[in-house]
């Protein structure tokens, strides 16, 4: 699977939330279907997101690149440490975590 292609497709056809605060809120409420986290996200953020995602049974995918690389991959001029897939749209992004 081409990660960049599927992420862009999810952004265009589905509902994707970018940012630590909003992603954390979705993890707490169980509204996200997949959380994507940059490998260099701060440790406390990683710990919190893994805890809340675990409580809500939301899969967490650790992106192999940095937050700068994740931002660039999405065509954004800023860093992205956390993002949540709420609706995948026409993408197959949920297959990252064995989703449907």
UniProtKB/Swiss-Prot annotation:
Gene3D superfamilies: 3.30.1330.30
GO biological process: one example: translation
Key words of the record: Ribonucleoprotein, Ribosomal protein
Highest taxon in the source lineage: Archaea
One Gene Ontology molecular-function label: structural constituent of ribosome
Coiled coil (residue ranges): none
CC terms in the record's Gene Ontology section: cytosolic large ribosomal subunit
Keyword Flavoprotein among record annotations: no
Pfam families on file: Ribosomal_L7Ae
SUPFAM superfamilies: L30e-like
InterPro entries: Ribosomal_eL30, Ribosomal_eL30-like, Ribosomal_eL30-like_sf, Ribosomal_eL30_CS, Ribosomal_eL8/eL30/eS12/Gad45
Family: Belongs to the eukaryotic ribosomal protein eL30 family.
HAMAP family reported in the protein's UniProt record: Ribosomal_eL30
Entry protein name: Large ribosomal subunit protein eL30
Taxon lineage: Archaea, Methanobacteriati, Methanobacteriota, Thermococci, Thermococcales
The gene coding this protein: rpl30e
